[in-house]
Amino acid sequence: VIDAANESAAALVNLLAQDFSCFRDEHVFEGRRKPVRILKRAQILVADLWACFEGEGYGDFRDIDKITMFADYRVPQILNSMGCISYSPPLDTAIWMKRDIPSGSSWEMQLRGKAVSSQTARRRR
């Protein structure tokens, strides 16, 4: 799979998601036709390969900069505490009351999307 990606981090992320269901982190968001693809695990694997091999051999990716931040639940917590992102009042209440936020739910997708979006905007500055 690594060889098939032709030294492309983005291609390897997509191949991992295509060929291995455990890397297919995507959900339909509020009725949209195309799923939102976060692909956190696939991106972490690619970033780990790059780091472990110090950008050489199996870690030689010409587009490693295409990998986004890894959108899990911790990053939005930290960004919110720093004032970088805010939650809608209903979501803020649900978090404060420690309610479960199901995987693939609208709230989960909003949290993860906000985290990626805020860091992408920060990186462009």
Language-model features and meaning:
Residues 1-125:
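HhH-family (HhH-GPD) DNA N-glycosylase catalytic core used in base-excision repair
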